[in-house]
Amino acid sequence: MDISAIKQLMGDGKLEYVKIGAPDMEGVYRGKRVASRFFLDSFADGFAQCDVLFGWDIAENVLTDHLKFSNWERGFADIVMKPDLATFAPVPWEENVASCICDLWTEHGEHVTISPRYVLGTLVERARALGFEPMAAAELEFRFFRENQVSLRDKDFG
């Protein structure tokens, strides 16, 4: 979606907030929810985000094992989230809310090279340079139980 279409959504009263973010090392979408006006005013420069998203686990416990990029010694510096407008889309289950995936940059204008989106993009480029077209699919695994959360917990199931 281009910025004029986003402005149109705002003008029509169909967009109040935008969820901006990027996947962390576990693939969890991390970011923030901003007012649509703030999104428009700031999307070109990007949005500050703490680099701790590369320094914690899926439960948000800060890792202390000598991480080079994100750590206490560096003070968990800010990185910049720059929205990829090609990923901008309304969130169907939330009224007047859209989402936009961001690419991550350092404050010095360099790619955050450990960002999963950057790593994937680099691998796609390398594969294409070798004459391959990468393809991927998701496999969802789930189980059905004749139980509920309480009965499962009582039986000490996972």
Residue ranges and their predicted role:
Residues 1-158:
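ATP/Mg2+-dependent ligation/transfer catalytic cores
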